[in-house]
């Protein structure tokens, strides 16, 4: 009986601690980039869906943007289509773009929507082609070595960058009590499809909606200093300094730049969160300490 009482007391404590945070975020929009291990473990997938439904139930407006790189790679392999990468970006020819649309706009998107709906939510799956949600243009990639007099332009196919976001559609869905789930496929001015990095799409969606938070789920505990210690709170200036001194480098750099630009573009804060931790989103927004790394020019509440 004591164990049951202790468990009940812990639950009551958590709910009591969460109350001021729920009040703070009621009516606010949070954009969550969903990817990595959180999309692979059945337990974590279920937990993510329940967390999103809970957020909506208490009056917070979650908007989900998802990735799907491993799933794209798996189908390309099964179809004997070779994958090539330039600076971490998948070279996307016409055949690869067809697969990207099938996987992101079909398999992955609808599985997330279905999971959220099974747990009591009202999710709607979208790609950037729906009502021109994500307007895009072809991404230009250049490379230059000391021996070159001019930079080399590298064609990586149907890889795009965001030009604009249809906020009218998203606001309409949010006001209708729906949870938008967005696949990062953009549409060009002539109707062409573009494969866009999900972190970048999430950042631009957060900026366009003037979201309270941008939350990027990752496979790491947060942004770390050179000694391996997680940095829990950083200003935009501190992030710039860490980029300049080489603390932030490699594959983490694009993600951090995306988080940084979102804050500079009007988002309240950006967070790098360990998606391997069960209920990581709720731990961040509903507890006193939070988890991961917060980037903001405000103090952590």
From Swiss-Prot:
It comes from Pseudomonas fluorescens (strain Pf0-1). Its EC number is 2.7.2.8. It is found in: Cytoplasm. The record marks 33, 255 as: Transition state stabilizer. One of its GO terms (molecular function) is ATP binding. The gene is argB. Pfam families: AA_kinase. It is an enzyme of class 2 (transferase). Disulfide bonds: none annotated. Keywords: Amino-acid biosynthesis, Arginine biosynthesis, ATP-binding, Cytoplasm, Kinase, Nucleotide-binding, Transferase. Catalyzes the ATP-dependent phosphorylation of N-acetyl-L-glutamate. This is Acetylglutamate kinase. Its main location: cytoplasm. One of its GO terms (biological process) is arginine biosynthetic process via ornithine. PANTHER family: N-ACETYLGLUTAMATE SYNTHASE (PTHR23342), N-ACETYLGLUTAMATE SYNTHASE, MITOCHONDRIAL (PTHR23342:SF0). Substrate binds at residues 68-69, 90, 195. Coiled coil: none annotated. Pathway: Amino-acid biosynthesis; L-arginine biosynthesis; N(2)-acetyl-L-ornithine from L-glutamate: step 2/4. It catalyses: N-acetyl-L-glutamate + ATP = N-acetyl-L-glutamyl 5-phosphate + ADP. Belongs to the acetylglutamate kinase family. ArgB subfamily. One of its GO terms (cellular component) is cytoplasm.
């Amino acid at each position: 009986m004591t164990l049951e009482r202790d468990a009940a007391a812990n639950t009551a404590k958590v709910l009591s601690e969460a109350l001021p945070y729920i009040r703070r975020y009621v009516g606010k929009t949070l954009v969550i980039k969903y990817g990595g291990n959180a999309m692979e473990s059945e337990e974590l997938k279920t937990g993510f869906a329940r967390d999103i439904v809970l957020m909506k139930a208490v009056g917070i407006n979650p908007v989900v943007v998802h990735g799907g790189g491993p799933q794209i790679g798996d189908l390309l392999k099964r179809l004997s289509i070779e994958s090539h990468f330039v600076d971490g970006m998948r070279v996307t020819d016409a055949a690869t773009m067809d697969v990207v649309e099938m996987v992101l706009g079909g398999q992955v998107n609808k599985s997330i929507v279905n999971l959220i709906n099974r747990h009591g939510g009202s999710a709607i799956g979208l790609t950037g082609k729906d009502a021109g949600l994500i307007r895009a243009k072809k991404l230009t990639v250049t490379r230059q070595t000391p021996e070159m007099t001019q930079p080399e332009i590298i064609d990586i196919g149907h890889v795009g960058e965001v030009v604009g976001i249809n906020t009218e559609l998203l606001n309409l869905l949010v006001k209708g009590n729906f949870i938008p789930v967005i696949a990062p496929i953009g549409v060009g001015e002539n109707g062409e499809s573009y494969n866009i990095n999900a972190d970048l799409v999430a950042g631009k969606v957060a900026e366009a909606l003037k979201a309270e938070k941008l939350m990027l789920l990752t496979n790491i505990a947060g942004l770390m200093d050179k000694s391996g210690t997680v940095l829990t709170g950083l200003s935009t200036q501190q992030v710039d300094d860490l980029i300049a001194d080489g603390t932030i480098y490699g594959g983490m750099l694009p993600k951090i730049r995306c988080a940084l630009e979102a804050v500079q573009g009007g988002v309240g804060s950006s967070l790098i969160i360990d998606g391997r931790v069960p209920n990581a989103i709720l731990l961040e927004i509903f507890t006193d300490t939070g988890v991961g790394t917060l980037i903001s020019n405000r103090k952590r509440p």
